[in-house]
C-alpha cells in the first residue's frame, strides 16, 4: 500500500514542534536544500517610480586634473576646507569624490569652481 499525500499531511499535523524541527533538518540534509525564507523579488514596474523622483543628493567627482594642477588644488581646498597636503593627495588620486551627498546648488557651485580651475568634473 502506497502512502498518499493525505497520509503525510495527517502525520505532519500530528507532530510536535520539536518533531517538525527534526523533520525539516532531515529534509535539508537529505535533499541539500535550505528552509530559510527566500527574498521576494521586486515587482518589474516598481523601479520606474523611483527613477522618476528627482535626485536630491549629488556627488562631485574630480575626473581629471587638467594642465593647471595648482589651481585645481586651490579650488579643492576652497571647496572642502582641506589642508594643502590632503587637497594635493585628493587631486593626485583622481578620479575621486571631492564632495559627497550635497544638494544640487552646492554640487553645481563646486563643479563650476573646479572647471574654472581647469579640471574635468562629473556630478552624479
UniProtKB/Swiss-Prot annotation:
Gene3D superfamilies: 3.30.1390.10, Single helix bin. InterPro entries: Ribosomal_bL12, Ribosomal_bL12_C, Ribosomal_bL12_C/ClpS-like, Ribosomal_bL12_oligo, Ribosomal_bL12_oligo_N_sf. One of its GO terms (biological process) is translation. Pfam families: Ribosomal_L12, Ribosomal_L12_N. Forms part of the ribosomal stalk which helps the ribosome interact with GTP-bound translation factors. Is thus essential for accurate translation. Belongs to the bacterial ribosomal protein bL12 family. Homodimer. Part of the ribosomal stalk of the 50S ribosomal subunit. Forms a multimeric L10(L12)X complex, where L10 forms an elongated spine to which 2 to 4 L12 dimers bind in a sequential fashion. Binds GTP-bound translation factors. This is Large ribosomal subunit protein bL12.
